[in-house]
Amino acid sequence: LYNAVEMGWTLLFITHTIPHKRTDDMLELMRNMDTARKLYGKGGTMSRLMKQLGFKGNVIRLEPTFGNHGIHPHTHTILMFDRKLTNEETERLTSYLKDKWKKSCIEAGLVTKKNERTFDKYGFCADTTGDIEKLIRYMTKNEKEQSVSGLAKEMTNAADKKRGRGVEGDDEDGKA
C-alpha cells in the first residue's frame, strides 16, 4: 500500500455492513452477506467502470464484531487504482458502489422496507480522503503504530476487535 501511494495511486477505503439485530443467527447472516458480496461484484457495468478508472486490486477483510445489537458483520475494503482519481470520478464511483451494494443486499434478502432507512444511513461508508496514515491507524486500531506491517497484520488477522468507531461514522455497535 505504501508503494501504491508513492506511485501516485488512489486508495479508496470502503466499509460495507448489513442490517442485523440481536436475535439474528450468525451463520445465516454471514451466508446472506456472502451472497450479497457475490452479487455486488458481478456485472458488466462494474467491470467497465473499474477498468476505466484503472482498478488494480483490492484488500478485503471480513470483520464480525459483537455489540448491543448482536453480531455486526461488515467488511473493510481497500480499492487500489493506478492513478489519481478526480473528485468527479471518485464521487461517481462511490455513488455507483453505494447503489450497487444496496441493490445486492435487497436481492440477498438483507434489506427490507422495515430496515431500509437504517441501511441507507449505515450500510455503506467510503473514506475518500486518501490519507494513508489515517487509514493505517484505523485498520490497525493503534494510534502509536503507523506501519504497513501493522496494516498487513490487521487485514489478515481473523481475531475479533473491540467495539469502536470507524472511519467516517462506521458504527461497529450494529445500528445497521
Q: Where are each of the predicted segments found?
A:
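Catalytic residues for metal-mediated phosphoryl-transfer on nucleic acids/nucleotides
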Residues: 1-75, 79-176
